[in-house]
UniProtKB/Swiss-Prot annotation:
PROSITE patterns: KAZAL_1, KAZAL_2. Disulfide bonds join C8-C38, C16-C35, C24-C56. This is Ovomucoid. CDD domains: KAZAL_FS (cd00104). Pfam families: Kazal_1. InterPro entries: Bifunctional_prot_inhibitor (IPR051597), Kazal_dom (IPR002350), Kazal_dom_sf (IPR036058), Prot_inh_Kazal-m (IPR001239). It comes from Chrysolophus pictus (Golden pheasant).
Length: 56
């Protein structure tokens, strides 16, 4: 099983678009898009990871 990852090096960003491209985090929460997910990754100090693309 290949690990899926997202490059969050440009984050955090102060505002995210409303674009809906869901990602499922390691906390089993569905994030609406990469921006929302990456902001959460930064807030978690890198403990949050990507489970898979799409809804959880």
């Amino acid at each position: 099983l290949a690990a899926v990852s997202v490059d969050c090096s440009e984050y955090p960003k102060p505002a995210c678009t409303m674009e809906y491209r869901p990602l499922c985090g390691s906390d089993n929460k569905t994030y609406g898009n990469k921006c929302n997910f990456c902001n959460a990754v930064v807030e978690s100090n890198g403990t949050l990871t990507l489970n898979h693309f799409g809804k959880c």
